[in-house]
């Protein structure tokens, strides 16, 4: 019985009956993501024949059934006629016909291929011209093509029959001209396009030549007739296909729409984005009314958007909460209502009945809020990246709106903002959604202070900033085990902290080494906090205790010392709820009724606490501005004692750095840090950015220890590059327009020691002054932050250099090459390793007084400057710099543009990195010796690995002169010329008389002429580029640049050495040629002797 019922109900289940037309929207239980609709059934394809596949192969649409039936009937009639003719003939006729057929077949077998080629040529030409003139489709504008074969061959046939002088072989050219004339007249009739007419003429000449040369087996009179016949057949076939068949590219003929009876009812999934989920009708469900959908909209229904909006509001709160009973009430709205009721209770003019009612409502809402428990947020929203804010007055924060939790570019809804009725003067501090590195989102109980009976968020909450408790490592590990990013550095977590014991208020906990967060940290690390600067303490005693504690909290992005904030103790004798709430504001009213007396006491308490807070803040700022005397004492005495002598040695382009290294002896390992400290003192960068000396020296000593003891790319090279960028940016430059004067570079700072908003600091060297207004200086046109980034980049630019080139690392699949995808491998490694060192320990944080935006800008500039030292990108930078600074159509360098200043700094560090050939001869040879030894070490390793030895790195065949000459000619020379042409090289004006100037010009011309007699044209051009004529200013003034002078002299010396080597090689070659005259006999004897020795060894 059950089986019969199931069989009877099965059809109803497969095709449920449609609902009545008058039915309203279906019940909510049926709206489960599926709708009833009707679809057209799939039709079975008809059987395919050979003719159908042939049409598909020819790219045409198969004909209709009626056309196919007529074609079959015609073929049948033709076959019957042929069969009847054969049956009615006599046997004798069959024999004669067979003999004639054999003769015809023997002749046609030799002519079949040319005839078929002619037919195909006419077929494809007709198809092309037909569709090119009209496009695909039916029409009657191309039937003139049927006359084309006749014009090609019938004219030739007539000339052959009636003009006997055209029958010889030499008259073939005349017959071809006759054919082309006939075809040309034919193309004029239908107004063929010019290119099509030319194509037809070329085609006619080609097919005539095929007929003339390929049909030699046929009689001469029969050749044009058969050619015309097959050509006409090809044209006719092409026109027939174009007339009776459709091209597949054309739109097919419209088909009749399916009737309602052909549709089958089905149940299908509903397209969520094409329905109005909160007000759709039955017609939309059953497919009777179409709802057009914009294809650009996301497939998300309105219910999903509402749920998403609500969930996102919860995620963006500092504490993700919801009611335990699952009632789905937004606690932020509930707490807003409680705040508004509490504000109304303060009004003394309200009647007692209203006050009683309001107190009852507040108690009910407080009881409901107290029953809610927080839930762990398993999602990590992206709150944006806020800069570190400075010390703010809590009173001023009360009327300020929260930061938006999400970027304005996205389409996500923003969290609900705090609203206040303004009926009371209570503080309404609003805490933004923050991210904590150590503990993620903490509960209020964990952040409160258990001693002294403190409670949280009562009506008398003062919301002062104190020191939070430290969460144990086991809790942090348990809570964030699944949320940490795979492969993250362990230093980015507080699990390595040595202190895990809760401390009392006013003390600080240990902090792990700082890290540099990026945007991915906010998505993968929910425990990152965006903090407040240090400056918010509850008392002066707490502040001094903090200064004595070395384990201070540091910002992970800008290095500021910070204090995390929690609520403090409340006055005794007041009951407060201990439960948490989901309100973003930290001032949540309790369930107990309030009165006016308590409110006045609260205001008095808040004023007292605020005065204490501001007092502690002032002490903090005073102490932060005072220099740390103990740290200065711990520094190396050499930094202070030899400052004057060291800066005097460095005030020269030819800084004798190797003599300084020998003088320092065992302390030469600290040359980079000492020179860096000296330069920062000279330029005033230590005072401008409030750089602590101890952290500064700690970092740069660790940085120079990371340089390897290799011949060239060591700490001495880094120090030389640092000196070069300092010299190029602080020495006087003739004719450079100076944007900021010396008195304008000293910017005034605020009372806290920081620059005011909108002010830009500029520096100047204490060891050098600008002689007059005809000189300028790069330090007056480039802000101090950018120059400091340039100096730091020079110190970092070859950190942890392995002594091998990028090409070697790529060829050997080194880990760095794999990590950086073979692009600027060493430069990326230097920058990343140097910044990793800076972020590894808090005692390296010498940039702690930079705000967030300054630090981000500084880091960007340092990385860009280091990456610019890649010689593979040398010519790209050179072309860009020439287009900006030296192009006649360019406006020159705009010092107000950050991009132009960045380009100047990049070219400056590039020039400093390869400044060896621009030094005097002794320094240049010392640097050349270092780079050559490093090259030879790489060549030895390449030979050991079986790799081809790179150019100039083979120790067995030294080419020192060619290496340096090529390096100067192609790399250093063009860069220095471009930098000099832009007017950025330091130098001095030289007063000369007209006669002296003329003589110097003549001497230069003579020198160039003498050199041109011995060198080729390329060397002459290079020599002219490296020997620029003295630039005359104001008639009798020219510029002398020490850098260009040394570069020119070194280049001349290397060229002379190359010439001497070439002459020596030529002399040795001539000697070898003279000696080789008697060598053949000796060679033969030597070969015979070797053969005899081999035979003796074989016999032995």
Curated annotation (Swiss-Prot):
SUPFAM superfamilies according to UniProt: HD-domain/PDEase-like (SSF109604)
Name used for this protein in its record: cGMP-inhibited 3',5'-cyclic phosphodiesterase 3B
Source lineage: Eukaryota, Metazoa, Chordata, Craniata, Vertebrata
Question: Which superkingdom, per the lineage?
Answer: Eukaryota
Membrane topology per record: Multi-pass membrane protein
Q: Which reaction does it catalyse?
A: a nucleoside 3',5'-cyclic phosphate + H2O = a nucleoside 5'-phosphate + H(+); 3',5'-cyclic AMP + H2O = AMP + H(+); 3',5'-cyclic GMP + H2O = GMP + H(+)
* Chain segments carrying region Disordered: 1-29, 400-423, 570-590, 993-1033
Please provide the record's keywords in A-Z order.
Angiogenesis, cAMP, cGMP, Coiled coil, Hydrolase, Magnesium, Membrane, Metal-binding, Phosphoprotein, Transmembrane, Transmembrane helix
Species this protein is from: Mus musculus
